A protein has these predicted regions:
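Conserved catalytic cores and adjacent C-terminal regulatory segments
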Residues: 1-337
Length: 337
């Protein structure tokens, strides 16, 4: 039986990356149970990976190799990355808070914190070293166009190969939060300036499917299966009368939620039509309750605990779907022992 190409896609969302990381922890557990293999990892059961912004961090964690060419981090350890380092990544000095007016007139955070975390976790690992084909969206400011970091291209061409820590700095350069990222290829021959690809592909699932088709033009959706993970969404139902008097400040705050939700939901809508099969396409996301506001940079303990609980709720409520999908992943793999 011909096996399907298995695709994993993870949305952007800052510290909310905890949510899909928790879901992946459960998926990894099911894969170990199904295969009776205590070393089973996510990387063994997917063929193409895509992550935007914080999703790129998770993908990098899942695919970075140790010295035995096995994944360096488990999904559980990626959750710990966020919980233990969130305050380092999103750490604004009093001076920076005043200078930026909380991000209104300057970037909200000094990038030294996030850069130190990437240095600690990924060191000199290069894009070409990742264990599986990878697609990570960014926006190139200097040329005014979308750009994708591709592991397959990096393996065949040095002009597409970057240090993972630099790539992630670019992929997470969310506007108003961090300054644009100016990076060079490993061979120092190409120099570019990027911002977070969430401006056009916060849900990179459709881009991942397009990447699959680019490399396999003779194959279609029926030849693939995809797991698409969100980072939690905020209700954006607004009263028309109230919003009729809003100005830039109100729309700036709400507009971020609306844009992020809209980008993610339109990709989901299109992929449901493309796949036309619930068994081959699974989208998992959660809705923030009314007592919690969706925030990319809130690192207070109670909020981090809530993000973990939201991920657990998704995993529990969709347990049957996740277990069924895990079974199909194993069936379409040659690593079943």
């Amino acid at each position: 039986m011909k096996t399907k190409t298995r695709i994993l896609s993870i949305d952007g969302g800052g510290i909310k990356g905890i949510v899909p990381a928790v879901v992946l922890k459960h998926l990894e557990k099911y894969l170990r149970q199904l295969t009776n293999n205590p070393d089973a990892r996510i990387v063994d059961y997917f063929d193409l990976f895509s992550g935007a912004s914080t999703g790129a961090i998770i993908i990098a964690g899942l695919l970075s190799p140790n010295n035995q060419d096995r994944p360096k981090y488990t999904a559980e350890e990626i959750i710990e990355l966020y919980i233990e380092n969130g305050h380092v990544i999103f750490n604004a000095s009093v001076f920076q808070e005043i200078k930026s007016v909380s991000g209104l007139v300057n970037v909200k955070y000094d990038p030294k914190g996030i850069e130190s975390v990437f240095e600690e976790y990924f060191g000199n690992t290069q894009l070409k070293d990742l264990l599986k084909p990878t697609l990570i969206p960014v926006y190139e400011l200097s040329r005014g166009k979308n750009y994708f970091f591709r592991q397959q291209k990096a393996r065949t061409s040095s002009r597409h190969n970057y240090y993972l820590k630099d790539l992630l700095r670019s992929a997470t350069s969310a506007i108003t939060y961090f300054p644009p990222s100016q990076i060079s290829t490993v061979n120092n021959k190409a120099h570019r300036c990027f911002i977070d690809g969430g401006v056009f592909a916060n849900n990179p699932a459709l881009s991942a499917y397009a990447e699959f088709r680019y490399h396999n033009p003779e194959l279609y959706a029926k030849d693939t299966m995809m797991l698409s993970l969100g980072t939690g969404r905020q209700s954006t139902h607004l009263d028309c009368e109230i919003t009729s008097s809003w100005g830039a400040a109100e729309w700036l705050y709400q507009g971020g939620f609306m844009t992020s939700n809209a980008i993610s939901s339109v990709s989901d809508y299109q992929l449901k039509a493309v796949y036309d099969s619930a068994s081959n396409y699974l989208r998992l996301d959660g809705l923030f309750d009314e007592s919690h506001s969706s925030s990319m940079d809130n690192t207070k303990k109670d909020y981090l605990d809530y993000l973990v609980s939201l991920g657990e709720s998704i995993a529990n409520e969709r347990q049957s779907d996740i277990e069924t999908f895990a079974q199909k992943l194993v069936e379409n793999s040659d690593k079943t022992s």
